[in-house]
């Protein structure tokens, strides 16, 4: 209805009486309410989205006034889902004479504007409806107002969304889930699945790779800093072996490993094997076949692979102090013949060439009559630095070739430390004749040259024979 209706009714009310006018007007109002369901007041001002939210799309209002409402409108026809919660209570206040307080359309517009501003500033108005649905919706609205602190962000979002749509803003918001519960559940499941996939991908990306640190290692860092060793000791609960037994078992295994290693090294290096066995025996150095301890006391010398004895030991040997252990001994003088004739130890044999040495000892090996006694050979030259040690090694090598390792014909070979030069001044009485002829004597230069050439020829022949023997072994199947 328009504002002209109110102006015409006001003119008729002035002619009629007060009570009759009031009853007639109420009937007309009820008829109009049943027909149109509400009074529509048109204002020149455009409605905002906030007003649409509060008043609804139709902006249904009763006659507005500044006083309290005196009649609750029956808005049962308007309770249709969404609009049932936006019904407002208002009635036209009449004065005692039956006249309306608002006398014109302008006052109605002003009253509507003031009431709209009042509703925007204040909390939502309480609704009085005649239908149970409206009452229930009003109760729900009241509960929602009580929890407005929790739902404030959602309400503000809805208001902003409606206002954007009214103003034609290009900014859009995220669409809500469908009102259909089945579709809403499907959408919720899809969203939850996507969120789970994103969370799993983030976790996988967040996990650092295990081996990338070694691939992208800085070359300036040392290996100990860049790739720390992570050692973890795993202890099993079911293990019933005590720690003491474990340590004992490990030590036994280590000792067994050492023993096996020693047996394996015998065929590789005689010197290392001899030194190890000597350290283990704690009784002294062993003889060449590793069966017994040396009968003569040894001292350190120039060559570590050979055993040295001092002049005192040789003198004791000559005097017969080792008869209980030694059945026979030989002192080999490796000097040249003119040196030997110039003075030598009592009972010494002059063998200055390898051929003579082999013929004497290896052509017919000397075997002791008593197996408990030994045969001892002592080599020496002027200083026991070259010729004596060379002859001793030569005899040992040839003896090895004739026997199966570690057996030897002559397992005990010694070197007189210091040679004849050191022995003669101390034990001149044990020398025959009691004199000393050096190798570089002026009277024996020609003889020295002849002996050297002869020794070189013998050495060349020996090397040639060894090469021939190696070739024969390689050719033979």
Swiss-Prot record:
Q: Per the annotation, which location comes first and is thus the protein's main one? A: nucleus
Q: Which residues carry this modification: Phosphothreonine?
A: 48, 68, 131
Q: What is this protein called?
A: M-phase inducer phosphatase 3
Q: Which InterPro entries match?
A: MPI_Phosphatase, Rhodanese-like_dom, Rhodanese-like_dom_sf
Q: Which GO terms describe its cellular component?
A: cytoplasm; nucleus
Tell me what reaction this enzyme catalyses: O-phospho-L-tyrosyl-[protein] + H2O = L-tyrosyl-[protein] + phosphate
State the gene name recorded for this protein: CDC25C
Q: How is it modified after translation?
A: Phosphorylated by CHEK1 and MAPK14 at Ser-220. This phosphorylation creates a binding site for 14-3-3 protein and inhibits the phosphatase. Phosphorylated by PLK4. Phosphorylated by PLK1, leading to activate the phosphatase activity. Phosphorylation by PLK3 at Ser-192 promotes nuclear translocation. Ser-199 is a minor phosphorylation site. Phosphorylation by CDK1 occurs at G2 and G2-M transition and leads to increased activity.
Q: What EC number(s) is this enzyme filed under?
A: 3.1.3.48
Give the classification, highest ranks. Eukaryota, Metazoa, Chordata, Craniata, Vertebrata
Q: Which Pfam families does the entry link to? A: Rhodanese (PF00581)
Catalytic residues in the record: 381
Chain's role: Functions as a dosage-dependent inducer in mitotic control. Tyrosine protein phosphatase required for progression of the cell cycle. When phosphorylated, highly effective in activating G2 cells into prophase. Directly dephosphorylates CDK1 and activates its kinase activity.
Where N-acetylserine occurs, the residues are 2
Q: Sites of the modification Phosphoserine?
A: 20, 38, 58, 62, 65, 123, 130, 169, 192, 199, 218, 220, 476
- Recorded source organism is Bos taurus
GO MF terms held by the record: protein tyrosine phosphatase activity
């Amino acid at each position: 209805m328009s504002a002209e209706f109110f102006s015409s009714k006001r003119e008729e009310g002035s002619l009629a009486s007060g009570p009759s006018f009031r009853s007639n007007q109420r009937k007309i109002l009820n008829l109009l309410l049943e027909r149109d369901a509400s009074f529509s007041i048109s204002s020149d001002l455009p409605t905002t989205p906030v007003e649409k939210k509060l008043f609804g799309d139709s902006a249904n209002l009763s006659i507005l006034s500044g006083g309290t409402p005196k009649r609750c409108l029956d808005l049962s026809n308007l309770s249709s889902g969404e609009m049932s919660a936006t019904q407002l209570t208002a009635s036209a206040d009449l004065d005692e004479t039956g006249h309306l307080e608002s006398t014109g359309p302008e006052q109605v517009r002003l009253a509507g504007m003031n009431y709209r501003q009042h509703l925007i500033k204040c909390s939502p108005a309480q609704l009085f409806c005649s239908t149970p649905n409206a009452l229930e919706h009003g109760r729900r609205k009241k509960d929602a107002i009580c929890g407005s602190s929790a739902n404030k962000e959602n309400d503000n979002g809805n208001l902003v969304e409606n206002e954007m749509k009214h103003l034609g803003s290009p900014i859009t918001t995220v669409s809500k889930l469908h009102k259909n519960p089945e579709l809403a559940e499907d959408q919720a499941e899809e969203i939850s699945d996507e969120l789970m996939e994103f969370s799993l991908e983030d976790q996988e990306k967040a996990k650092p790779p295990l081996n990338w640190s070694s691939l992208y290692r800085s070359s300036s860092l040392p290996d100990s800093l860049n790739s720390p060793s992570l050692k973890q000791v795993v202890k099993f609960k079911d293990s019933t072996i005590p720690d003491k037994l474990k340590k004992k078992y490990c030590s036994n295994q280590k000792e067994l490993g050492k023993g096996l290693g020693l047996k394996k090294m015998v065929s590789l290096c005689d010197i290392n094997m001899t030194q190890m066995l000597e350290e283990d025996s704690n009784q002294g150095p062993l003889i060449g076949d590793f069966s017994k301890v040396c009968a003569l006391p040894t001292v350190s010398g120039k060559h570590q692979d050979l055993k040295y004895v001092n002049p005192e030991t040789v003198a004791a040997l000559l005097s017969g102090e080792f008869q209980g252990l030694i059945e026979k001994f030989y002192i080999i003088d490796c000097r040249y013949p003119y040196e030997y004739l110039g003075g030598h130890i009592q009972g010494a044999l002059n063998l200055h060439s390898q051929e003579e040495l082999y013929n004497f000892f290896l052509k017919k090996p000397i075997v002791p009559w008593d197996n408990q006694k030994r045969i001892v050979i002592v080599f020496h030259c002027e200083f026991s630095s070259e010729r004596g040690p060379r002859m001793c090694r030569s005899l040992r090598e040839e003896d090895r070739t004739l026997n199966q390792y570690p057996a030897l014909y002559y397992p005990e070979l010694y070197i007189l430390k210091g040679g004849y030069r050191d022995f003669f001044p101390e034990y001149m009485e044990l020398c025959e004749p009691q004199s000393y002829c050096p190798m570089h004597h002026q009277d024996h230069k020609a003889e020295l040259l002849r002996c050297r050439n002869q020794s070189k020829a013998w050495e060349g022949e020996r090397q040639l024979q060894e090469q021939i023997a190696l070739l024969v072994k390689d050719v033979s199947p």
